[in-house]
Amino acid sequence: MDPAFHEALASGIEALGLPVDEAARALLERYADRLLAWNRKVNLTAITAPAELAEKHLVDSLVLLPVLSGARTLLDVGSGAGLPGMPLACARRDLSVTCCDGVAKKIAFVKAVSAELDLPVRGVAVRAEGDPEREGLPRADAVVSRALADPDRWVPVGARYLAEGGTLLAMLGREVDRAALEAVGAAEGLTLVGLDVYELPISRAARAVARWQRR
């Protein structure tokens, strides 16, 4: 992998103080390598520059590690190429991850690469519409989506996959209104328990992670 990839990954992990050891970094590099290789045949990502991929796909997924410290299961909805689920599984081998997406070719990538890297990841080719039993999806300790960035759309769907005591996560790439986040959660019986705002260290792109739990 390009040296720029290693530099971007290391600087992002260190700048944000993320708990990612050397074994996890090696897995992340292998995942990124497979992602770029598959992307030549299957449309998985528009980001192909190694440094940008490291920051905007890997580091931006790994920012969830601190808020997942107590979780044993994770459901990643609209996962695409396994983001953020597969990078998180690289860093948390004890975390059981389910990645779902309506595009079968993307889930084929998730299944093949998770098997190759021996990651605790299951891929399910289904569009999540809020009916876990029919869709064959689990209720999880943590439920997240990068694909559904609009909380008004995401929260009503994602809340249906929460296990008892679970946390619903929204990864936001824009300015956020705390009152609006509180309101959309309250409509589903959820309380906003956290709103973490940060910048990606290289691009300075603004990001936020919102967290809700059931009242």
UniProtKB/Swiss-Prot annotation:
UniProt KW keywords: Cytoplasm, Methyltransferase, rRNA processing, S-adenosyl-L-methionine, Transferase
Top-rank taxon, per record: Bacteria
CDD domains attached to this UniProt entry: AdoMet_MTases (cd02440)
Segment forming the signal sequence: none
Matches recorded under InterPro entries: rRNA_ssu_MeTfrase_G, SAM-dependent_MTases_sf
Top-rank EC class of the record's enzyme: transferase
Keyword Cytoplasm appears in the UniProt entry: yes
The EC number(s) this enzyme carries: 2.1.1.170
Family statement drawn from the similarity comment of this UniProt entry: Belongs to the methyltransferase superfamily. RNA methyltransferase RsmG family.
Protein name per the record: Ribosomal RNA small subunit methyltransferase G
Biological source species: Anaeromyxobacter sp. (strain K)
